[in-house]
Curated annotation (Swiss-Prot):
Organism of origin: Mus musculus
Biased segments, Low complexity type: 23-32, 183-200
Dimerization (DIM): region residues: 62-102
Gene name of this polypeptide: Sox10
Transactivation domain (TAC): region residues: 353-466
Chain intervals with Polar residues compositional bias: 440-466
Signal peptide: none
Protein's recorded name: Transcription factor SOX-10
Length: 466
């Protein structure tokens, strides 16, 4: 009993009364079999704000008395009796501005009052429970409680808050900065895991839109291999930044200017246009392209002044390729594939009949096709306008005949239309700009019934950069 007397003196000392939390782990086993005297000595000085904890500690002390044999309790008491509690260092904030002051914790809210009390009880009853599973269960139980069940915890939390305000009148909450601050805050507000569901939903939506972009890379739109902005079947919206992985053909080489511009116009990245009616906003989005400057488009043309003089290749073919690239907003050059007959240069007197096939979409109903005769040497060019109603203007021959044999006069010589490539492509209104164009197989065939998602004929050429 002398050891217990010494310990009770330590507990009743001023240092012991200032540090009730430090004593609580060791004081519970140090009580004798009667257990009452030591407990009353320890709890002679707590304020009214700790009455709820006092009752809980009494129950824990009684449970611990049954858990440990008498010899263990006496050994613990002997060790603790000679310990000077003034040597215990005070906790300090490592990254705080005032390192001399101890860190003051926030007052517990109602859920924390419930969770702390229930966690101690459940941890004693079910020691095999993992702490994370225990937290999930406590959160679920708290959400199932009605207002009458929550009332005692709410009242206790309010009382703790008022007591905390008295004890620390100049207290100011200063949260520690974390890298993932929003995620931690969401998990604190939703203790049961609602934050995880929200994060999973956002990730799932992002990968859904990314999946739509490369679902049919081989049978999609003609530019889908080199331009992931137009997913097959879902090409009903303005161009959005590429979201496909960088393992695809050229999605990693997308033009940063186009990405920045489309982000600036759209304002929201990665919108899934599969379920959006684009009829109302397409004109508004395309009207923003009126601010393009001619000098900005000049940088995509070859430096020697003419669109066409590239080696011994057909000049008209490269003139057409660069013009189509400028019109569709892509900086990729269209190389000459081995199996495609690009238009050949002939004297001005020889005119071969060719057709420009234009696909137009009415306001409602399936797309229909009109064949416009033109005195051009372009073999068979499919100019597809999937969204915008007016037909593509017929392209006449002198705009594409550039070679070493011919003077550059036809660049300005055509009287029926405005002069030059810019008149045919860059100055069209918002309802006439094509989103993508492609060079098709030269073998002429009759009008086929195309389904929007599967382009079987004509066979499109693959586009690559030299």
């Amino acid at each position: 009993m002398a050891e217990e007397q010494d310990l009770s003196e330590v507990e009743l000392s001023p240092v012991g009364s200032e540090e009730p939390r430090c004593l609580s782990p060791g004081s519970a086993p140090s009580l004798g079999p009667d257990g009452g005297g030591g407990g009353s000595g320890l709890r002679a000085s707590p304020g009214p704000g700790e009455l709820g904890k006092v009752k809980k500690e009494q129950q824990d002390g009684e449970a611990d008395d049954d858990k440990f044999p008498v010899c263990i309790r006496e050994a613990v008491s002997q060790v603790l009796s000679g310990y000077d509690w003034t040597l215990v260092p005070m906790p300090v904030r490592v990254n705080g501005a005032s390192k001399s002051k101890p860190h003051v914790k926030r007052p517990m809210n109602a859920f924390m009052v419930w969770a702390q009390a229930a966690r101690r009880k459940l941890a004693d009853q079910y020691p095999h429970l993992h702490n994370a599973e225990l937290s999930k269960t406590l959160g679920k139980l708290w959400r199932l409680l009605n207002e009458s069940d929550k009332r005692p915890f709410i009242e206790e939390a309010e009382r703790l808050r008022m007591q905390h305000k008295k004890d620390h009148p100049d207290y100011k909450y200063q949260p520690r900065r974390r890298k993932n601050g929003k995620a931690a805050q969401g998990e604190a507000e939703c203790p049961g895991g609602e934050a995880e569901q929200g994060g999973a939903a956002a990730i799932q939506a992002h990968y859904k839109s990314a999946h739509l972009d490369h679902r049919h890379p081989e049978e999609g739109s003609p530019m889908s291999d080199g331009n992931p902005e137009h997913p097959s079947g879902q090409s009903h919206g303005p161009p959005t930044p590429p979201t496909t992985p960088k393992t695809e053909l050229q999605s990693g080489k997308a033009d940063p200017k186009r990405d920045g511009r489309s982000l600036g116009e759209g304002g929201k990245p990665h919108i899934d246009f599969g379920n959006v009616d684009i009829g109302e906003i397409s004109h508004e989005v395309m009207s923003n392209m009126e601010t393009f400057d001619v000098t900005e488009l000049d940088q995509y043309l070859p430096p020697n002044g003419h669109p066409g003089h590239v080696g011994s290749y057909s000049a008209a073919g490269y003139g057409l390729g660069s013009a189509l690239a400028v019109a569709s907003g892509h900086s990729a050059w269209i190389s000459k594939p081995p199996g495609v007959a690009l238009p050949t240069v002939s004297p001005p007197g020889v005119d071969a009949k060719a057709q420009v096939k234009t696909e137009t979409t009415g306001p409602q109903g399936p797309p229909h096709y009109t064949d416009q005769p033109s005195t051009s040497q372009i073999a068979y060019t499919s100019l597809s306008l999937p969204h915008y109603g007016s037909a593509f203007p017929s392209i006449s021959r002198p705009q594409f005949d550039y070679s070493d044999h011919q003077p550059s006069g036809p660049y300005y010589g055509h009287a029926g239309q405005a002069s030059g490539l810019y008149s045919a492509f860059s100055y069209m209104g918002p309802s006439q700009r094509p989103l993508y164009t492609a060079i098709s197989d030269p073998s002429p065939s009759g009008p086929q019934s195309h389904s929007p998602t599967h382009w079987e004929q004509p066979v499109y050429t693959t586009l690559s950069r030299p």
